[in-house]
Each structure stands twice: as structure tokens, then as C-alpha cells.
């Protein structure tokens, strides 16, 4: 089982243990230290924590590359660069029976890093697999899951043609059904974690559906919208100048919090200064802990938006401010609470939560995690770049970490703030004018 965000180890091993116990009626459990047949890896790997790329290198007697061995600045592009080089240097021998890839959208890059028109990491994984059927050696157990709306770096979507290029046999491998009727591709239209009001708002603001200049990214046909849980009201086709109405039926958002709570579960507030924003944040978190009975760790999460530099700076600033309010904080990878700048070697890259502290995290480490109450801070860092799809994806990822409630805040005044207010006011139905094809059409699924 492979994933990209290293801080997910605790969550994924916990879920494996939970569901193995469930399906074995308590007779089996998962312990990563003793179970050698089911391995959990992050995609890259390190000396103290094996990963897919590193394990494959070592199996073939090759020295694994590190961040120092690539000129790529983004971690995922660095890994893809090294995977491409490995494929160019050696022939990969089969060593696994099955590979399941989560966060598949983070393991693709632009065409300049492809290996023979294929996405390098996926081809590396495919080559390292034993055939599932000796008579059909091209059939291998490579399973990947992705959410294109959560891509923070690349606009590529991990469809079979994108991953495997012009190889028609592999492209057909994910179409149709297996014997017995099991679909080879499954699109999840129902969301259990995030309340409907938050999910629809995250989709709308992430895609820019109510953006005055027109949507930036999204789907442009009824079938594709239906597949992710929406209805296109009427017989509307996505033609320039035509009005489109989308609705998400309640059965596709079964999280009951909105109905039980009876009040908005998504709030958006703006402030005249960062100081005001942080003061309001501290007071709300203190109220959650003292009056609402939420635990600081795992129940509450603060997610920081912005570019790498902006988010790092704001993360430290907000964590320090919360400490002044006697709120213990945890910065992911730190070995203890209230360590605002954890650094190698005194850090733990696998760690995201710490008992007794509110986790304050940049979006890249928050991916995959969830909490009852999520505070999304620094909306202004996105609003200044409102026509950037990756920045909007940050907003989508941050809001959908919420199991119950989300609070979004920013400073200053930007046109995107008014767009957000319209999104929230629209509820679970959106009406907009389709103006032109989006920068990124994510409806090209298999």
C-alpha cells in the first residue's frame, strides 16, 4: 500500500488494523512490524522508513537517490525524476504481487518527466509486479485511487491513457468489468466524511463555478457530474452562454451533522488585520476546548493556506500566537508540543498529531487527515491568486478535512471573498452561466 504524504502512516496503519479486524471478526490484526506480506510505504523512502522507490532500488542493488540528487524543487517531481532515471538505467524485476496506490494525483507530473510517454512512478510500480495471470502477463494487480481536485502541484489527471501512454492493452485494463460483474473503475459519488454544505462549497469555490469570469476547472457534461454525486437540473448542455444549475441530492452527502446541528456548519469571516484574525481564531479554539468539549488533538485542526514561503511564515506566526493564549500547539514532525520550527535530526516526518496540542499545519501535510472542527486560515493568500487552479485546490483540500464544522478566514478585501459568500449562500445548489471551456476539464475519466 503506497501513498505520497508521509504524515499519513499513523492514519493508514490504523485503518488497516481496524478493517482487518472487522473482516476477520477480530481473529486477525495488522502490525507493520510483524506482517511482512502487507507492507505500508510512502512513495519515496528514507533510511529509517522504507518507501516504494527506495525498496525497489535496494532490491536491484542500486543506491537510492535523495533530494540532493535531483534539481526538481517540488518533492513529487523530484521523486518522479529519480524514478524515471532508474527506469532508464536498469530493467525492473517483479517483486510484488499487488500494489495499491493512494493519493494517485500526487504521483503524476508534466510531460517533461515522462518515461517513454508513461508516468514514471506508475510504470515503475507496474514493472515491479508479478503477473496475475501467466497466460496474460500484461495483467497485473496495480490499483490506484485519486481525487483530481486535491492535486496541489500538477494539473495532470491519472487516467489510464495519461499513465500508460499509447499502450492500448493497458488502457483497456481499467475499462469494463471483471468476471462476476466487478467494475474495473469505480467513481465515488457519495461522501460520508464531510457534511454536504461544506463539500458543495469546497467543490464550487475550488472549481470557480460562481467566478464572474467563468469556471476555471471542473466537469462539462451531465454524466461526469452525476458520477461525482451531482444532478444537472433540466436538459442543460454546457454551451457557451447557457445557464447551468447543479444540485447535490442529500443521499449523496449522508453525514448527519448539518441536520442535527441546525445551524450553518461552514462559516466565512474576514478581518482588517492578521492580528484580528489570529485573536478570533484563538478565542474560538479556546471555546471549543473549554465549552464544546473538543480535544485539542485530533478533534481540532488549523490548516494554513498559501505558497510554501507564505504558509511556513504564517504557520509559525499563528502557532506562536495561540501559545500566547495558553493553547498548546503541535507543528507536524516535531517531537514535542510548542516546538515552532522542528528541524532535522530532531523531528519525526511520520507524525501529524500530538496528544494535548492543536495541530497547526500547512496544506501539504494536512492532506489525508481529518478533524471534527477545521479552521482554514490565510484565505487572502489564495484570493490574491484566484485564477490559479492549484491555489484553489488548496482551498478544496483544506475545507474537506472537516468531519463536522469548518471556519474559513482571511484578511483584507478581495473579489474572491464575494465569490465565497455567494457559494455559501447557494447551499447545495448552484446556478451559473457557462462561459468557456475551463483551463482544466477533469471529466475525461475512463
Language-model features: locations:
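Alpha-helical nucleic-acid-binding subdomain
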Residues: 1-191, 195-213, 234-249
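Short beta-alpha junction loops
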Residues: 5-7, 148-150, 306-307, 335-338, ...
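Short, charged/polar "capping" segments at the starts of alpha-helices
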Residues: 10-12, 152-153, 309-314, 414-419
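Post-kinase regulatory C-tail/linker adjacent to protein kinase catalytic domains
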Residues: 32-34, 219-228, 437-440
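Short, glycine-/Ser/Thr-/acidic-enriched flexible segments
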Residues: 79, 106, 149-150, 365, ...
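Core RecA-like ATPase module of SF1/SF2 helicases and allied nucleic-acid translocases
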Residues: 154, 159-200, 207, 213-220, ...
Amino acid at each position: 500500500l503506497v501513498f505520497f504524504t508521509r504524515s499519513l502512516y499513523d492514519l493508514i496503519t490504523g485503518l488497516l488494523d481496524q478493517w482487518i479486524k472487522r473482516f476477520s471478526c477480530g481473529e486477525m490484526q495488522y502490525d507493520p512490524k510483524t506482517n511482512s506480506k502487507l507492507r505500508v510505504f510512502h512513495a519515496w523512502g528514507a533510511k529509517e522508513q522504507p518507501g516504494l522507490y527506495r525498496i525497489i532500488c535496494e532490491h536491484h542493488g542500486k543506491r537510492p537517490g535523495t533530494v540532493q540528487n535531483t534539481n526538481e524543487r517540488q518533492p513529487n517531481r523530484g521523486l518522479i525524476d529519480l524514478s524515471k532515471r532508474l527506469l532508464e538505467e536498469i530493467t525492473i524485476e517483479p517483486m510484488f504481487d499487488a500494489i495499491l496506490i493512494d493519493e494517485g494525483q500526487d504521483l503524476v507530473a508534466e510531460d517533461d518527466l515522462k518515461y517513454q510517454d508513461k508516468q514514471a512512478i506508475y510504470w515503475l510500480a507496474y514493472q515491479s509486479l508479478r503477473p496475475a495471470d501467466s497466460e496474460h502477463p500484461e495483467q497485473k494487480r496495480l490499483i490506484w485511487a485519486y481525487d483530481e481536485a486535491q492535486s496541489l502541484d500538477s494539473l495532470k489527471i491519472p487516467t489510464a491513457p495519461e499513465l500508460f501512454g499509447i499502450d492500448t492493452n493497458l488502457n483497456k485494463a481499467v475499462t469494463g468489468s471483471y468476471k462476476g460483474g466487478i467494475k474495473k473503475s469505480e467513481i465515488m459519488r457519495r461522501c460520508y466524511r464531510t457534511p454536504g454544505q461544506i463539500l458543495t462549497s469546497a467543490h464550487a469555490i475550488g472549481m470557480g463555478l460562481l467566478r464572474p469570469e467563468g469556471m476555471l476547472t471542473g466537469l462539462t457534461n451531465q454524466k461526469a457530474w452525476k458520477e461525482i454525486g451531482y444532478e444537472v437540473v433540466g436538459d442543460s448542455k454546457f454551451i457557451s452562454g447557457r445557464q447551468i444549475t447543479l444540485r447535490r441530492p442529500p443521499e449523496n452527502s449522508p453525514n448527519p451533522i448539518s441536520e442535527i446541528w441546525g445551524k450553518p456548519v461552514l462559516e466565512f469571516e474576514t478581518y482588517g488585520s492578521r492580528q484580528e484574525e489570529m485573536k478570533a481564531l484563538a478565542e474560538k479554539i479556546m471555546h471549543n476546548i473549554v465549552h464544546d468539549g473538543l480535544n485539542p488533538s485530533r478533534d481540532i485542526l488549523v490548516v494554513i493556506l498559501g505558497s510554501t514561503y507564505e504558509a511556513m511564515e504564517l504557520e509559525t506566526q499563528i502557532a506562536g500566537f495561540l501559545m500566547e493564549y495558553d493553547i498548546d500547539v503541535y507543528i507536524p514532525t516535531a517531537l514535542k508540543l510548542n516546538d515552532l520550527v522542528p528541524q532535522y535530526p530532531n523531528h519525526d516526518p511520520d507524525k501529524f498529531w500530538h496528544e494535548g496540542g492543536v495541530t497547526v499545519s500547512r496544506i501539504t501535510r494536512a492532506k489525508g487527515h481529518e478533524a471534527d472542527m477545521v479552521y482554514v486560515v490565510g484565505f487572502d493568500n489564495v484570493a490574491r491568486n484566484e485564477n490559479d487552479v492549484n491555489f484553489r485546490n488548496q482551498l478544496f483540500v483544506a475545507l474537506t478535512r472537516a468531519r463536522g464544522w469548518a471556519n474559513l478566514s482571511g484578511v483584507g478585501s478581495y473579489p474572491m471573498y464575494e465569490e465565497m459568500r455567494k457559494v455559501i449562500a447557494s447551499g447545495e445548489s448552484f446556478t451559473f452561466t457557462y462561459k468557456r471551456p475551463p483551463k482544466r476539464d477533469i471529466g475525461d475519466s475512463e
